[in-house]
Amino acid sequence: MNITLILFLIGILGFVLNRKNIILMLISIEIMLLAITFLILVSSLNMDDIIGQTYAIYIIVVAGAESAIGLAILVAFYRLINSPVKNPRSNYSGDPAPPSGGRGPYLHFNLLPVVSSCNLIQSRNYSSVLHRKIPTHTSCVWAGLNPSFITGFSDAEGSFVVTILKNPRYKIGWNVQARFQIKLNEKDRALLLLIQNYFDNIGYISKINDRSTVEFRVSDITSLNNIIIPHFEKYQLITNKYGDLVIFKQIVSLMLENKHTTLEGLKEILEHRASLNWGLSKTLKESFPSIIPVKRVKIENNILSNLSSLPLLPGGGNWVAGFSSGEANFFITMSGTKVWLRFSIAQDSRDILLLKSLVKFFNCGYIAQYKNRKVCEFIVTKINDIIIYIIPFFDQYKIEGSKYNDYVKFKEAAILIKNKEHLTEKGLNKIIELKNSLPPPASLEGGMNKNI
């Protein structure tokens, strides 16, 4: 009886003193149950009732088994939540294409949104990355995104931003912040989580909001210098965003030297900021009228912009898949019973060299230039080109994100047209259904000049 009482008291004390540790609390409860079971057994053994003794033994066997299983589960769970997450990039060793006609090891998150090997945490992560450098290994052998895909997607949707705002709390009256960001529709949150995971979970993913937007942002200066910039130096940008990266890197270097904390250093940063994106704001121009912008690197000086380089570029297929996941459009248009398909990528006219390179890359299509807008567009409309070149490419190098569903419907319509099923009522109705489920074509106002 004394042993039973001691066990019971130990269980109670353990429960009370360890309320913040669920593991120890549950162990304490198991000890109390063991004490009660032992009490029943001792009491029944002092009786001549064979039924009571049998019942007591039964209770001990069941309770013991339950306790053992419960503790085993708890220990396994405890080890799981405390085990380190393997860096998903640690197995990269090259940038090969996935197997022809197949998905290969790359994750198709539209079909499998939960990535067991990724630490997908929708919160800020400001862990120190002072000594972390971007790995040199690059072959995607885990359920993640190819490095060249990430660069292509960043060429489409990423931004290198430097904000300079008045703030009296700072010594010089101005606050400087540099950041890399990708902003998308909420439906592409899963894709941003994969991108964040590739970058060692630095930065943060914004919470769900009423604007239906989601943003991946990295503003920690050390993370930018040690992880973001080295990635884009190894897997280079191809659009005019390459020029933004060059200036952005220079500004980050100045900030690492604490130049942003002095007025002279701020002016030096402003000279670079004036050539980044859309230049200086009206407030900055009025406050610093003597700023002379540094010369922006010309994209023609980037060897990747050569018209013949894209097909030869290592990882070029993955870059195009990433870029298309951000910028491509898959359209179905109809007039009565006539059906047309259109695959297109529109860009600022500054990137016309890139679009001309896509014509060579896909071996089809043409470039459209618009008179009233500084926009040019790579367009493929011939059904044979779509069947022979476009669909096989995207079957091998997958579109990621919500745009994948557009591609699947586009492909289904193309197959129906190829097989002449659009000439039947059933086939035409199916194409109408597919068309109505796709986003409407964007209107590019103004006249068009067609260049082959």
Curated annotation (Swiss-Prot):
Enzyme class of the recorded protein, top EC level: hydrolase
Subcellular location: Mitochondrion membrane
Biological processes per GO annotation: ATP synthesis coupled electron transport; intron homing
Region (ndh-4L exon 1 encoded): 1-80
Bilayer topology annotation: Multi-pass membrane protein
Function as written in the Swiss-Prot or TrEMBL entry: Mitochondrial DNA endonuclease involved in intron homing.
Organism: Neurospora crassa (strain ATCC 24698 / 74-OR23-1A / CBS 708.71 / DSM 1257 / FGSC 987)
GO (cellular component) term, any one: mitochondrial membrane
Protein name: Probable intron-encoded endonuclease 2
Record bears the keyword Nuclease: yes
